[in-house]
Design a protein with these regions (language model features):
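Acidic, surface-exposed loops and disordered segments
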Residues: 1-239
Length: 239
């Protein structure tokens, strides 16, 4: 499965089975975690049993069940691009999980941050978590949620400001962004294409917009075949 196919196949799953993740798959996932931590200076951790962050928590409103394995997305508080990096590298890890027939879901607020799932240093910030594991077939509730989300994807014309006809690579990138998860499916990222230069920006709402920004960038780069400069208004470099 390619990354593009993983983007097409990914769904945000909330109901997990107790089936453990195989050792060989965990090894592959950990190799990517190590590589991305080194590249980004993040401190992503895989937690085999993070169920305490969800067990008996009213904040999850019953949407999450059977959560066990987690990616804990954390990094240095002083990192100006922390949340963007978390979104970017976290989504790359999600896609690797999808390619191994696992499922995942971004969780920013519906978990117990006071649970002792991981020990952080004073200089680190826990941004969010990503449950990972095996799931049953889509439940009726999940199908309804996915149908509602799919029907609310932001139209490309509302994502893009451009003074020319949209080139094919840009269109493909934006289509991939439409499939990117975001808080309440808000899809806050704005792309501007002027004088042959593409830039991406987002309003920093102090919550999860910058995480969504990183997720959107990862999807765009895979489909658009290039790389964004880090930060708001970073330019896209076509490869």
């Amino acid at each position: 499965m390619t990354n593009l196919e993983a983007i097409d196949n990914r769904r945000s799953r909330r109901l997990y089975l107790p089936t453990p993740i195989e050792v060989d798959k965990l090894a592959v996932l950990q190799s990517f975690i190590d590589a991305y931590n080194k590249e980004s200076n993040l401190s992503i951790r895989f937690v085999e049993d993070g169920s305490a962050a969800f067990d008996g928590l009213r904040k999850s409103y019953g949407l999450f069940k059977g959560v066990r394995s987690l990616l804990v997305m954390a990094g240095k508080k002083e990192d100006a691009n922390l949340k963007e990096k978390v979104g970017y590298y976290g989504e790359l890890l999600v896609l690797e999980a999808i390619k191994m027939d696992l499922e995942a879901c971004w969780v920013g607020g519906s978990f117990d941050r006071k649970s002792d799932i991981v020990e952080l240093t004073d200089s680190e910030e826990l941004v969010c978590v990503i449950p990972i594991g095996y799931t049953e077939k889509l439940s009726f509730k999940e199908k309804m949620v996915h149908q509602m989300v799919a029907g609310k994807s932001k139209p490309i014309e509302k994502m893009l400001v451009s003074d020319v006809k949209t080139p094919r690579w840009l269109l493909e990138g934006l289509k991939a962004v439409q499939k990117a998860p975001s808080a309440v499916n808000h899809q806050p990222v704005l792309f501007e294409f002027r004088d042959g230069v593409l830039k991406a920006s987002v309003e920093d709402d102090g919550k999860f917009n910058l995480v969504d920004f990183g997720i959107a960038k990862s999807h765009f780069e895979i489909a658009g075949q290039g790389r964004f400069e880090p930060g708001n208004n970073g330019k896209f470099i076509k490869l």
